[in-house]
């Protein structure tokens, strides 16, 4: 995909996020929207995957460590062809396979169940070690929230990743600077994030996580990096793409009402139309 196609796809992913959360009347739109560009690049450009064969042995693995932002993950998987886009409206409903957190047993394309913050990166490190032990060449990607990295388990896993020189592992931090209680700098600041990962022997890349040029360059650089794992610190805007949700901690974990949903979809439709004019 070229940059324009990626931007159009990310806009569709964002529409899916808003639709899913509105339908469920609960969920986490803010962090899903902030990471939509990263999800899109991973699943439509970067990763070796096949929606027709989700469990193929040589596929790249992805672990959503910040599992509460499942709406963004699900919308990406649906638009990539793992399951019908129409199923997004069943989010969190009784009997639906699309529950509030990713479930590897029931959702095509999900490599690891997640939800308890800090655990996803540990699973990703284990997958990367497994690949090394088996001489497999698949790569492992994991997406964390910047509030999540307040968890001590994140740094235990990072210590091991650096020690084992896991150059097949890419850790992405969605650095939107907001969590449910407000700014991460006010709650329990993890800054400087880059220096912490560097201390654990990571190659660190700082980018604008809502800019496809920078996203592409970062993942290409990560592929060229040998002997150490890579951490991509992606500065993003929480709620990106919906004006009244942007940079607002209050949209961490609530659904838009009917009026707000209509406004959000109108904005995203206009954004899509503008992209089609380019």
Annotate each predicted stretch with a short phrase.
Residues 74-75, 103, 153-155, 181-185, ...:
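Short acidic, glycine/serine/threonine-rich loops at helix termini
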Residues 80, 187, 246-250:
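Short secondary-structure boundary/capping segments
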Residues 68-69, 73, 176-177, 211, ...:
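Glycine-rich beta-alpha junction loops
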Residues 109, 113-116, 121-224:
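Thiamine diphosphate
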Residues 10-26, 174-176:
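N-terminal capping segment at the start of a domain
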Residues 212-278:
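Glycine/aspartate-rich loop-and-adjacent alpha/beta segment that forms the canonical ThDP
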Residues 17-21, 32-163:
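Cofactor-binding active-site loop characterized by glycine-rich and histidine/acidic residues
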Residues 1-13:
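N-terminal hydrophobic or amphipathic helices/low-complexity stretches enriched
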């Amino acid at each position: 995909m070229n940059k324009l196609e990626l931007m159009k796809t990310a806009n569709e992913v964002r529409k899916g996020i808003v639709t899913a959360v509105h339908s469920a009347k609960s969920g986490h739109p803010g962090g899903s929207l902030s990471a939509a560009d990263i999800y899109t690049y991973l699943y439509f450009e970067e990763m070796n995957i096949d929606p027709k064969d989700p469990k193929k042995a040589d596929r790249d693995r992805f672990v959503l460590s910040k599992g509460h932002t499942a709406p963004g993950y699900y919308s990406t998987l649906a638009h990539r062809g793992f399951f019908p886009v129409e199923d997004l409206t069943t989010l969190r409903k009784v009997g639906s396979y699309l529950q509030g957190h990713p479930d590897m047993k029931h959702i095509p394309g999900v490599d690891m169940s997640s939800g308890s913050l800090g655990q996803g990166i540990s699973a990703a490190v284990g997958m990367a070690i497994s690949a090394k032990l088996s001489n497999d060449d698949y790569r492992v990607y994991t997406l964390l929230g910047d509030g999540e990295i307040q968890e001590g388990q994140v740094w235990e896993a990072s210590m091991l990743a650096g020690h084992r020189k896991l150059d097949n592992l890419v850790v992405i931090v969605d650095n939107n600077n907001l969590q449910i209680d407000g700014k991460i700098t006010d709650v329990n600041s993890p800054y400087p994030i880059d220096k912490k990962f560097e201390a654990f022997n990571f190659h660190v890349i700082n980018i604008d996580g809502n800019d496809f040029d920078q996203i592409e360059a970062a993942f290409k650089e990560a592929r060229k990096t040998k002997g150490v794992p890579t951490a991509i610190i992606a500065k993003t805007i929480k709620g990106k793409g919906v004006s009244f949700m942007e940079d607002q901690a209050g949209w961490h974990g609530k659904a838009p009402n009917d009026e707000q949903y209509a406004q959000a979809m109108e904005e995203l439709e206009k954004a899509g139309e503008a992209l089609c004019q380019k």
